[in-house]
C-alpha cells in the first residue's frame, strides 16, 4: 500500500508494479495521476485518515505500507504498521520525524549538535524567544513546527525591526498546522542533505548532496548537486551527524532524508 498517488509518488507506484507487486494506492483526489496506472487498486481516502486507511489495509490484507515525498501520511503509515504487525516506524517516531520541535528535543537529549531553539505556542512565548536572541545578539530563523518545503520560513537578521519580527510570527504561524512554531539560532554555512537507509537499527549512508537555495530570507530550494563537493573529512563528519540524528529520532528501518548546515 502506497499513501499518496500524486506525481511525486508515481515512481514508487511504477517500481512496485515492475517488481510484480499488487499495488494499492491511497489518495483523497480521485483524479490523482497515480490512479491512472493500470492494474492497481485505488482507494479514495485522505492520507491522514488513519482509521479508514487501516480498514482498507485490512480489507486488502496488505504485506507492507509506505509513503514518500510527503510528511503528513507518516502517522498513518506507523499506525497501520503497528496494527498489522508490519515492518515500519512507531507513531512517536513519525511525530519526531515530522515535527521540528519534537525532533530538536530528541536531538538535544541525544547530544546531536543543533542550534539553540525555542518551541513557541503563543505570542508571549515568541516574544521571550526573540528577547533571548536580542540579548545574545544572534540572528534567528522562524519556521512552522509541522510543515516542509521551506513553507513559512523567515530569517530575522535585524532584531531591531519590530514590524519585521511581528510579520515573521504571523507568516510562520499561518503555515503551522498544529499552531506551534520554532524559533532557532540561524547557522551560517552551506547546506547539505543526506540520504540514508536504516536496516535493523544500522544506518547506511547512500548519498550526500549539496543544496542550492534562494538564500535569505525564505531559503526555497532551487536545485541540488551530487555527489557533494565538500572535503572528505567534512563528509565523514556529516555522515556521523546524520546517522546519530536518524537513531536519535527512532528510525530503525527505512529510508531517511536529513538536512544539515556545515558550520
Language-model segments: residues:
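Short catalytic-loop micro-motif centered on adjacent basic/acidic residues
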Residues: 2, 64-67, 115-118, 155, ...
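Hydrophobic residues in well-ordered beta-strands that form the structural core
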Residues: 25, 88-90, 116, 141-142, ...
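Phosphate-binding core of ATP-grasp and ATP-grasp-like enzymes
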Residues: 171-180, 185-228, 236-263
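Conserved residues at the C-terminal ends of beta-strands
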Residues: 68, 120, 209
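Short hydrophobic patches on amphipathic alpha-helices
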Residues: 57, 130-133, 246
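ATP-binding N-terminal substructure of ATP-dependent carboxylate-amine bond-forming enzymes
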Residues: 1-93, 124
Amino acid at each position: 500500500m502506497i499513501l499518496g498517488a500524486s506525481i511525486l509518488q508515481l515512481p514508487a507506484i511504477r517500481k512496485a508494479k515492475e517488481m510484480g507487486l499488487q499495488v494499492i494506492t491511497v489518495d483523497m483526489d480521485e483524479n490523482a495521476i497515480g490512479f491512472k496506472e493500470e492494474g492497481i487498486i485505488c482507494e479514495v481516502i485522505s492520507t491522514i485518515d488513519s482509521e479508514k486507511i487501516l480498514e482498507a489495509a485490512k480489507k486488502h490484507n496488505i504485506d507492507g505500507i509506505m509513503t514518500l515525498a510527503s510528511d503528513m501520511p507518516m502517522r498513518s503509515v506507523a499506525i497501520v504498521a503497528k496494527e498489522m504487525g508490519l515492518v515500519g516506524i512507531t507513531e512517536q517516531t513519525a511525530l519526531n520525524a515530522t515535527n521540528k520541535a519534537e525532533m530538536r528535543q530528541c536531538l538535544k537529549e541525544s547530544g546531536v549538535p543543533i542550534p539553540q531553539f525555542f518551541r513557541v505556542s503563543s505570542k508571549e512565548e515568541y516574544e521571550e524567544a526573540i528577547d533571548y536572541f536580542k540579548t545574545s545578539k544572534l540572528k534567528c530563523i522562524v519556521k512552522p513546527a509541522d510543515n516542509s518545503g521551506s513553507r513559512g520560513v523567515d530569517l530575522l537578521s535585524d532584531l531591531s525591526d519590530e514590524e519585521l519580527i511581528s510579520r515573521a510570527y504571523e507568516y510562520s504561524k499561518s503555515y503551522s498546522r498544529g499552531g506551534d512554531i520554532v524559533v532557532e539560532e540561524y547557522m551560517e554555512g552551506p547546506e547539505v542533505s543526506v540520504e540514508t537507509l536504516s536496516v535493523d537499527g544500522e544506518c547506511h549512508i547512500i548519498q550526500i548532496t549539496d543544496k542550492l537555495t534562494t538564500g535569505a530570507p525564505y531559503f526555497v530550494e532551487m536545485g541540488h548537486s551530487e555527489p557533494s563537493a565538500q572535503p572528505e573529512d567534512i563528509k565523514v563528519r556529516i555522515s556521523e551527524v546524520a546517522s546519530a540524528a536518524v537513531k536519535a529520532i527512532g528510525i530503525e528501518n527505512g529510508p531517511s532524508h536529513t538536512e544539515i548546515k556545515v558550520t
